[in-house]
């Protein structure tokens, strides 16, 4: 099957969140399963710099008028992969050649022409489905998140016109980000007037790229079974729950997985010493990773102090006010906190102040550093993910893989991947972390105290850590589920 993945970012070339990890790992898993998978990316500077052997494929006209842009093709080499990924890149410097964040300007405001920048991404996908590259035409286009949300819309109308028979799949990675644009921007999109309707892209008088993907795609997926159920409720549906209930029959929740070539404590080059736990032993490397990390971050070098880590965007969604509110308990119990992330200015400042007040117990690094992220998981004891909502979450999966036990709220993909340390689940060998239910300080505080209590029982801690590290989370299983969804999309498209 010829499958085109359409994404705004891809690890290791460009990453602002978990979308990039999926976009980098899923094509490789599909290729390993015998599928012909390629990717389509916008020509951001980091992407152009990372794609090798770029060569012109074709030129095409923008949906908004006479402007023409180039499509180039090349290879993305991924460490440990059996073969490179074939990548199409949209060559449009006027839209994509901007420094820093790919979506926002220096003042953290979305670029005013984002509707054009990402309409072009979906438009190029639809052009490929109509033969833009004479040598390769996708049978299925898989569009990821709002940035690629117009691809299914363009394909729908191209099929109506008899220009293609390509099927479409749309994946929601985070429903909170919907690609909302002013109604007058619809004229730039090159879609027929009926598309700007409640049964289409129209959302409270505005244009929603997310809604376009949800309405027009042949099949829908999201990144965990629990999140697939949650987004059909008013509480988690962000105003789109009615549409999602209507399309619930074509919606599938497929858990993200961990790329073992990138996230593997036994082979991770970012760690001072590797470690693994096939039988609960061979863990000396983790103790050394913790000691080196404490020294590197200026924390007190205490092996007995449980080290809590937080690798996250600093936003309200991530439950960081719970972490701030519980920090006194964490420190009073003898713990340490190491944070890596960036986001809302108020949260950044609040964490900086706590680090300044207790520099030997709290480390805060604002920004993102992939190497440091690996080192935090390698040296950490507990990974904090107390989210208000979490579509899937990769952070807790990295924590599981590296034996940094996740402390999470029972929501979305967190509920699907972490088993609480209840007496029953510890006895059965299923427990892998600490789970709380209510999004409040009291419930979070109880989970914190349970983590400290287990840490004091070293044999039990080692058993739970072993459970966590052995938890299967492979892309081969996820790829098989996606392939079945692609088959369903082809059937819906009539091919």
Curated annotation (Swiss-Prot):
Gene3D superfamilies linked: Glycogen Phosphorylase B (3.40.50.2000)
Residues where ADP-alpha-D-glucose binds: 15
Catalytic reaction list: [(1->4)-alpha-D-glucosyl](n) + ADP-alpha-D-glucose = [(1->4)-alpha-D-glucosyl](n+1) + ADP + H(+)
Superkingdom to which the source organism belongs: Bacteria
GO MF annotation list: alpha-1,4-glucan glucosyltransferase (ADP-glucose donor) activity; alpha-1,4-glucan glucosyltransferase (UDP-glucose donor) activity
GO biological process annotation, one example: glycogen biosynthetic process
Pathway where this protein functions: Glycan biosynthesis; glycogen biosynthesis
Enzyme Commission number: 2.4.1.21
Pfam families xref list: Glyco_transf_5, Glycos_transf_1
One GO location term (cellular component): cytosol
Family stated for the protein in its record: Belongs to the glycosyltransferase 1 family. Bacterial/plant glycogen synthase subfamily.
Name by which UniProt lists this protein: Glycogen synthase
Organism: Variovorax paradoxus (strain S110)
């Amino acid at each position: 099957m010829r499958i085109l993945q359409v994404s705004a970012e891809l690890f290791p070339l460009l990453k602002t969140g978990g979308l990039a990890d999926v976009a980098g790992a899923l094509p490789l898993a599909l290729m390993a399963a015998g599928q012909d998978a390629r990717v389509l990316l916008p020509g951001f500077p980091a992407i152009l710099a990372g794609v090798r052997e770029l060569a012109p494929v074709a030129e095409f006209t923008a949906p908004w008028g006479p402007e023409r842009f180039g499509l180039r093709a090349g290879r993305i080499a991924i460490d440990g992969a059996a073969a490179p990924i074939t990548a199409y890149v949209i060559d449009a410097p006027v839209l994509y050649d901007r420094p820093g964040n790919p979506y926002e300007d220096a003042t953290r405001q979305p670029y005013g022409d984002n509707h054009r920048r990402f309409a072009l991404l979906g438009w190029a996908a639809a052009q490929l489905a109509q033969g833009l590259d004479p040598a390769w035409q996708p049978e299925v286009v898989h569009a990821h998140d709002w940035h690629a949300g117009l691809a299914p819309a363009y394909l729908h109308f191209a099929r109506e016109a008899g220009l293609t028979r390509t099927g479409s799949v749309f994946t929601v990675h985070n429903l909170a980000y919907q690609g909302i644009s002013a109604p007058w921007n619809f004229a730039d999109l090159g879609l027929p007037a009926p598309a700007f309707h409640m049964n289409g892209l129209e959302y409270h008088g505005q244009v929603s790229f997310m809604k376009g993907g949800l309405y027009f795609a042949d099949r829908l997926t999201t990144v965990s079974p629990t999140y697939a159920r949650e987004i059909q409720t008013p509480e988690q549906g962000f105003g789109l729950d009615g549409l999602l209930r209507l399309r619930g029959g074509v919606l599938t929740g497929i858990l993200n997985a961990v790329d073992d070539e990138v996230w593997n404590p036994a082979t991770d080059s970012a760690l001072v010493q590797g470690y693994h736990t096939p039988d609960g032993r061979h863990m000396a490397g983790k103790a050394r990773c913790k000691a080196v990390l404490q020294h590197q971050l200026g924390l007190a070098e205490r092996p007995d102090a449980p080290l809590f880590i937080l690798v996250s965007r600093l936003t309200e969604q991530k439950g960081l006010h719970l972490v701030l509110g519980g920090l006194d308990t964490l420190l009073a119990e003898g713990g340490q906190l190491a944070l890596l992330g960036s986001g809302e200015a108020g949260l950044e400042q609040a964490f900086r102040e706590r680090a300044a007040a207790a520099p030997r117990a709290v480390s805060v690094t604002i920004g993102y550093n992939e190497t440091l992220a690996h080192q935090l998981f390698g040296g950490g004891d507990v990974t904090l993910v107390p989210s208000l909502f979490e579509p899937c979450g990769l952070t807790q999966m990295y924590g599981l893989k590296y034996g940094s036990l996740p402390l999470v709220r029972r929501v979305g993909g967190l509920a699907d991947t972490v088993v609480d340390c209840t007496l029953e689940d510890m006895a059965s060998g299923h427990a892998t972390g600490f789970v709380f239910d209510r999004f409040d300080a009291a419930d979070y505080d109880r989970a914190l105290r349970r983590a400290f209590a287990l840490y004091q029982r070293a044999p039990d801690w080692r058993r739970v850590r072993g459970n966590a590290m052995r938890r299967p989370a492979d892309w081969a299983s996820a790829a098989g589920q996606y392939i079945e969804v692609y088959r369903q999309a082809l059937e819906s498209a009539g091919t």
